[in-house]
A protein has these predicted regions:
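A conserved beta-strand element that flanks and buttresses the S-adenosyl-L-methionine
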Residues: 97
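Conserved alpha-helix/loop element of class I SAM-dependent methyltransferases that forms part
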Residues: 4-24
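Short alpha-helix
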Residues: 162-179, 185
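Short catalytic micro-motifs in class I SAM-dependent methyltransferases
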Residues: 100-101
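Conserved class I S-adenosyl-L-methionine
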Residues: 24-32, 124-151
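A short glycine-rich, Lys/Arg-flanked "PGG" loop and its adjoining helix->strand segment in the class I
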Residues: 109-124
Length: 191
């Protein structure tokens, strides 16, 4: 499935990053962590993970997934917007997981500043976002030329398509302005 492919590619990059950050246990923040699939796997490696999500249902699912895997003691759960996580952390974290969230945030630069503020010096950010260029390419390949010419307006109010697909160059610029150093990039999928 697409989700399995995304996870496989993610872990191809994430595992070396975890190794590079140290033997652990690391303090990890999964900001907007949803059902906790990645957070639970990181906790299984012995790291201490704080997962935050705006949805009470997602936090409950993540908590259950952690309990099912026997890692609930390695995890802390916070129901809040990722923008508000700073007030819930006792100290800076070593690694931030921020996957499939930036494209839903109306003020992405402020969000990135918040994440920067909770990261320890020398820490890392794993960022995955919905690439607007991939959306464009997909629509061109399937022949949606009129839709592309209209600027690809969002068709429905309630869809799984994000509100703010991001241009990679714009995101890279925001990161560099904030002081982040980009050490790697991987395309996950187009279709």
């Amino acid at each position: 499935t697409k989700g399995e492919l995304r996870q496989a590619i993610l872990w191809q990059d994430l595992q070396p990053l975890l190794n590079q950050l140290g033997p652990g246990p690391l303090r990890v923040l999964d900001a907007g962590g949803g059902e906790g699939q990645t957070a639970v796997k990181v906790a299984e490696m012995g790291h201490h993970v704080t997962l935050c999500d705006l949805s009470a249902e997602m936090v409950a699912r993540a908590r259950q997934a952690a309990a099912d895997k026997g890692v609930i003691d390695n995890m802390h759960f916070v129901q809040c917007a990722a923008q508000d996580i700073a007030q819930h952390l006792e100290s800076p974290v070593d690694l931030i997981l921020f996957h499939a969230v930036l494209e839903w945030v109306a003020e992405p630069q402020e969000m990135l500043r918040t994440l920067w503020s909770v990261l320890r010096p020398g820490g890392a950010l794993s960022l995955m976002f919905y690439n607007a260029n991939g959306l464009l390419m997909h629509n061109m390949v399937v022949g949606n030329f009129d839709y592309v010419q209209l600027g690809m307006p969002k068709k429905k109010k309630r869809t799984l398509s994000p509100d703010y697909p991001r241009s990679p160059q714009q995101v890279y610029g925001w990161l560099e302005e904030q002081g982040w150093r980009i050490t790697g990039k991987t395309g996950v999928r187009v279709f």
